[in-house]
Amino acid sequence: MSETATAYKLFRCLQCGFEYDEAIGWPDDGIEPGTRWDEIPEDWSCPDCGAAKVDFEMVEVDR
């Protein structure tokens, strides 16, 4: 498997700046570490401000 296929991504809320890291997940909402952004339900919202999932953008990070 290539590094690109396994690299985890980071998504930032455009409303408040909250960051969802696929490597960490969000256990408070039952989202296990390693959960890909596409696997999160469409009705999930930002835990900090309540913004919709569509209000997040992928952030380029060096790991």
From Swiss-Prot:
One of its GO terms (molecular function) is electron transfer activity. Gene3D superfamilies: 2.20.28.10. It comes from the Bacteria. Keywords: Electron transport, Iron, Metal-binding, Transport. Binds 1 Fe(3+) ion per subunit. The keyword Disulfide bond does not apply. Fe cation binds at C13, C16, C46, C49. GO terms for biological process: alkane catabolic process. Residues 8-59 form the Rubredoxin-like domain. Its cofactor is Fe(3+). PANTHER family: RUBREDOXIN, RUBREDOXIN-1-RELATED. Involved in the hydrocarbon hydroxylating system, which transfers electrons from NADH to rubredoxin reductase and then through rubredoxin to alkane 1 monooxygenase. Belongs to the rubredoxin family. This is Rubredoxin-2. It comes from Rhodococcus erythropolis. The lineage of its organism: Bacteria, Bacillati, Actinomycetota, Actinomycetes, Mycobacteriales.
